[in-house]
Amino acid sequence: MKQRFSALDIAAIAAELREQVVGCRLNNFYDLNARTFLLKFGKQDAKYSIVIESGFRAHLTKFDRENAPLSGFVTKLRKHIKSRRLTGVSQLGTDRVLVFTFGGGANDQDPDWTYYLVCEFFAAGNVLLLDGHYKILSLLRVVTFDKDQVYAVGQKYNLDKNNLVNDNKSQSTIPHMTAERLNILLDEISTAYASPTSINEPLPDQQLSSSTKPIKVPKPVSLRKALTIRLGEYGNALIEHCLRRSKLDPLFPACQLCADETKKNDLLAAFQEADSILAAVNKPPVKGYIFSLEQALTNAADPQHPEECTTLYEDFHPFQPLQLVQANRKCMEFPTYNECVDEFFSSIEAQKLKKRAHDRLATAERRLESAKEDQARKLQSLQDAQATCALRAQAIEMNPELVEAIISYINSLLNQGMDWLDIEKLIQSQKRRSPVAAAIQIPLKLIKNAVTVFLPNPESVDNSDESSETSDDDLDDSDDDNKVKEGKVSSKFIAVELDLSLGAFANARKQYELRREALIKETKTAEAASKALKSTQRKIEQDLKRSTTADTQRILLGRKTFFFEKFHWFISSEGYLVLGGRDAQQNELLFQKYCNTGDIFVCADLPKSSIIIVKNKNPHDPIPPNTLQQAGSLALASSKAWDSKTVISAWWVRIDEVSKLAPTGEILPTGSFAIRAKKNYLPPTVLIMGYGILWQLDEKSSERRKARRLEMEVVETQGKVSELKMEGTSVTSEDNIQDVVSEVSYNEDTNNQSTPDTTGSDIHIVSEKRGKKGSKVITAKKVSAKERREARRARRQTALEESLKAPISIEDATDPQTILAILKQKKAKKKHAAREMEISSQIPSNDSSNVQTPTAESEIEEDGVSEPISAEVIEDQSRNSEAENEKGLSTEQRDEKKHAKVESFQRQEMPRSLFEEIFFAIDSLTPNPQQQDTVINAVPTFAPYNAMTKFNQKVKVMPGTGKVGKAARESIAYFMKKLPKSSKEAAYLENLKDGEIVAPISVSRLKMVFGSSGNTKKSKK
């Protein structure tokens, strides 16, 4: 199995990385394990992740991996190259070295601002960070070649910038295979491996000692190895491919190579084909091929069970090697080489992790089984003790005379004062003559005032008198061999311990008491064993979970996020996408780039209220009232109404009734908008939001949902066409039904939601900073030409009178206040002149009566404090910096510059590709998947609670004091408890990251309500 990159692999990977990642900034650098790292790059609307395993691989990946604790090496790299722009990805000549260049300064080539990340893929590998002068700043491992060459911090790395392969031009400098070069190469191999005798025959001195010790003959070098050593840029697989293409054995000894012209020509043609492969891998995208082996697995326990096949990845290449094709390996083709390599190594990682998890599970099962066996042994020993005690008691009851005789015999000897050793000798000598002595076991237990005797086993006693007689020979044999021990049941006799102070039946009663004690102990042990087993099982599960959590190498297929997930978003109950900005910059971005004709602009007259955009499916169709109400709920939830628990109304207007230009023609600041229509207020809404899960479906399930959606739209369209016919509207077969319906919808929409006439009405300025009175209002009224002339005449007269009162020049003034007044007047004159020029340029030549000028009074409210100032002063303050820059420009140049600036702030229509992504999201995200649907991921969402009626996983969110992160994690844990542990949905929820869980929530403090109203559980504050 291939495990590390060749020079050819690095060339293909470098070419694709140059095509995709160059120009991106390094967002962050992560540890995956001791030698594997993850680099995350990003630029506008694009993110890339690169996995680097020192000595083995480097490629783009679509899989998410959990990060390991931060190491000192990664900390050093973050310090130097984080947030820097990647300016080059190159291969160092034909070596297995990949160099990432992070440029800076003039033309990204200033050595003082340039860094190199060098990745070595030979031997044990290494990762080094160099500055612009090739000085090592940090490295993964210190390497010592000899006394004079050491790779360590502070040393200089041998990096020739001219040897970096950055494009096809650099690749063309590598020499191709020619007939002359091939002849020189073959001659060199023939000379180096001339004949076996020149290399393998021993010297004369060695021949003298050959009689005592045989000399080991080295194995001849193969032709493939000899070529690989001298042609490293081709790689081992490509060289073998060339040899097989020229019908040469790769294992052919190099020393036996003959100068056959036919073979040389075939080999030259094969190497020229290899040169074309080398040229192709530098022109991205490069196709990748994975070669796999089908392995059959049989069930040994059930041979009749059919064989199961599993696919094992064996090799990967940017071409199809002839040796693998001839070996009948299964080939999988990928459009890019990064995808190919990512699939190969990710599959291997997944197999390793699966095996590791399987081993942990097997160990846990063995521990649990061992605990069960231990408890079973304890219970079995107690049960055996009960049976033995009962058997001993029965034996005593069946032989009371013998038992009494034994007790009397021993007590009589003790009463005589005989020594204990003498008693044992006496009993031993009388065993053959006395049945009483024969039944006694030696040695005695007189220290316990007890003696062990052998009594007939009740289970083996027959009713006949013969079988009940005691055999002296058997007793003698058992006594001599000492094989019968206390408590051991033989086939005919059983050993019973008798208390010398008790009679026969008293000893039997004692055995029954022991049996009863064993029974009680068994009951208690069984109860304790059950608890101990559960405790052991719980501990094993905790250890298993802890070890699984500690395993930082989980591989998860990354979910491609939708473009709208960077905003606040939800899908309404009628299937409309609703978007909201997170801050003023996002409000601006949302308005300028993600709005289309027919969309609805929703907002609230409260501070911090987000700008909400309802995306319309058809420009002429009206938005359902429920969707508007739900969008208003999101606008209120993102404002101060959530914290203050205020119930007010949001409002909406059409998107074409919103502008970035103030009535004076000035461009409003970021996040502020001019509303040029009457606001349509929505009913007051209770602040109840919801947090739930949308399940992402696979392609087939999404197609089914799309077909159902289109079918419903067709039914609705046919219904509208029927209404048209009933109203007398003619619809021919040549008409486009959808166009007619859209026209009718537009007519209905214009009747019900017509744009109010702004002539003589108020123009509202909407911004993030809105006070108690709501948005700013600038009243614009009609001004006739006569009134304008009189106003200009009055201003000139006033200016003349003021000029007569004031000093003519600054030199004539004496006090500082007068000088300041003169400067202010000069500045005001310049601004008034610019204002007059602007007004005159805005007056049409044919219709001067329709021009509207703002009145002088406006109101700016910030942080709840109102300060009335004139609209003219607002304009003057905004023009201070521009007036200075436009002094040297002509009137036409100033008009062109202003027109260009205004055009840059105009709303742009959202591209069609994003519309298709919206419809794809609506079709692929479902709150309640059907039985035939296949779920591939989980997407958290935050929406009004009345928009989540179809959700199978949801919680209620209300204003409170709880933290967002903790509440969101509790919600995910609550959802997981409701699902089976082995279900895919639970696994998808478990794989959600904290960022994905918290990102949809648009409030800062909250209270989660779990379950139904009858069984609620509030999140901890």
Curated annotation (Swiss-Prot):
Residues 462-480 have a biased composition (Acidic residues). This is Ribosome quality control complex subunit 2. It comes from the Eukaryota. Signal peptide: none annotated. One of its GO terms (cellular component) is RQC complex. The modification Phosphoserine is found at S478. Component of the ribosome quality control complex (RQC), composed of the E3 ubiquitin ligase rkr1/ltn1, rqc1 and mtr1/rqc2, as well as cdc48 and its ubiquitin-binding cofactors associated with the 60S ribosomal subunit. RQC2 binds to the 40S-binding surface of tRNAs. Its main location: cytoplasm. PANTHER family: NUCLEAR EXPORT MEDIATOR FACTOR NEMF (PTHR15239), RIBOSOME QUALITY CONTROL COMPLEX SUBUNIT NEMF (PTHR15239:SF6). It comes from Schizosaccharomyces pombe (strain 972 / ATCC 24843). Residues 457-484, 746-801, 832-905 are annotated as: Disordered. Residues 746-761, 839-856 have a biased composition (Polar residues). Residues 876-905 have a biased composition (Basic and acidic residues). Belongs to the NEMF family. GO terms for molecular function: ribosomal large subunit binding; tRNA binding. It holds the Pfam family NFACT-C. InterPro entries: NFACT-C (IPR021846), NFACT_RNA-bd (IPR008532), RQC_Subunit_NEMF (IPR051608).
